[in-house]
Amino acid sequence: MEAKPRVKVVLLDIEGTVCPISFVKDVLFPYALAALPETLSTEWDSSSFLPYRSAFPPEHSSTPEALLSHVRDLMAQDLKIPYLKSLQGYLWLRGYESGTLKCPLFPDVYPAMKKWKENGAKICIYSSGSVAAQKLLWRYTAEGDLRGCIWNGVDGAEEIEGGYWDTVNAGLKQESTSYEKIAKANRALGEVGEWLFLSDNVKEVRAAKESGMKSFVVVREGNADVSVEEKNRQVLITSFREVEAMVEVTGESA
């Protein structure tokens, strides 16, 4: 019997892959919009808020009203602008800390992550949400604080924190060069062909495969439909439990 391909590193998307799209669209985004007016009113000149305000273009950060209007426009268009993502993470912090926000993971996610880590594999995250927002989400899940499951090594040569990636430190998720950069920064963990990227987005899966990574499309309730053409081209899974039917997820220490 032919041995299954080996995977040393699993790279995970978040929205639609480990948690429902509805948590982001219907819970996190509305929370940020609702919290923003009071934050602008009470923290406009505060040292903690200034870095987020200063990241916005001058024409949109001259007054609280201008910034609020710009944020509403960006979110209405679902644009993934880095300075917007950073601000959202700042706004979500209090919601997570107060217990108002808690990320509901799909039931197969944590057991799979736990098993992969126990087998010596490494787990990394790549999302359009900022690294700060990613860390909040994994800290405050319905399963508890799962940051310990995620690789937190630092590549000394490039001074990049290896476990969390977004569109700022990696690049756009539909470009193969972004996946090449992630694998190169963590080259001690395994060759690019020993990485597996899991995402609900077919275009991201294509880009990851172009870089040399393995990649599967994750099909979840509430996700966009996958075309018949792509179903014939891609490997589709409906649960992380299906991953090890196709690859062996294990690290050097296993």
UniProtKB/Swiss-Prot annotation:
- List positions binding Mg(2+): D13, E15, D200
> Which reaction does this chain catalyze?
5-methylsulfanyl-2,3-dioxopentyl phosphate + H2O = 1,2-dihydroxy-5-(methylsulfanyl)pent-1-en-3-one + phosphate
Which InterPro entries does this chain map to? Enolase-ppase_E1, ENOPH1_eukaryotes, HAD-like_sf, HAD_sf
Q: Copy out the cofactor comment.
A: Binds 1 Mg(2+) ion per subunit.
CDD domains for the chain: HAD_EP (cd01629)
- Protein residues bound to substrate: S127, S128, K173
- Name its cellular compartments: Cytoplasm; Nucleus
One of the Pfam families matching this protein, by short name: Hydrolase
**Has keyword tRNA processing?**
no
Co-factor(s): Mg(2+)
Q: Where does it mainly reside?
A: cytoplasm
Query: What are the EC numbers?
Result: 3.1.3.77
Drop me one GO molecular function for this one.
Answer: acireductone synthase activity
Its pathway, per UniProt, is: Amino-acid biosynthesis; L-methionine biosynthesis via salvage pathway; L-methionine from S-methyl-5-thio-alpha-D-ribose 1-phosphate: step 3/6; Amino-acid biosynthesis; L-methionine biosynthesis via salvage pathway; L-methionine from S-methyl-5-thio-alpha-D-ribose 1-phosphate: step 4/6
Q: Name one GO biological process term.
A: L-methionine salvage from methylthioadenosine
Q: Which is a Gene Ontology cellular component entry for this protein?
A: nucleus
Keywords assigned by UniProt, alphabetized? Amino-acid biosynthesis, Cytoplasm, Hydrolase, Magnesium, Metal-binding, Methionine biosynthesis, Nucleus
Listed under subunit, the entry gives: Monomer.
Give the UniProt family note.
Belongs to the HAD-like hydrolase superfamily. MasA/MtnC family.
Q: What is this protein for, i.e. what is its function?
A: Bifunctional enzyme that catalyzes the enolization of 2,3-diketo-5-methylthiopentyl-1-phosphate (DK-MTP-1-P) into the intermediate 2-hydroxy-3-keto-5-methylthiopentenyl-1-phosphate (HK-MTPenyl-1-P), which is then dephosphorylated to form the acireductone 1,2-dihydroxy-3-keto-5-methylthiopentene (DHK-MTPene).
State the protein's name. Enolase-phosphatase E1
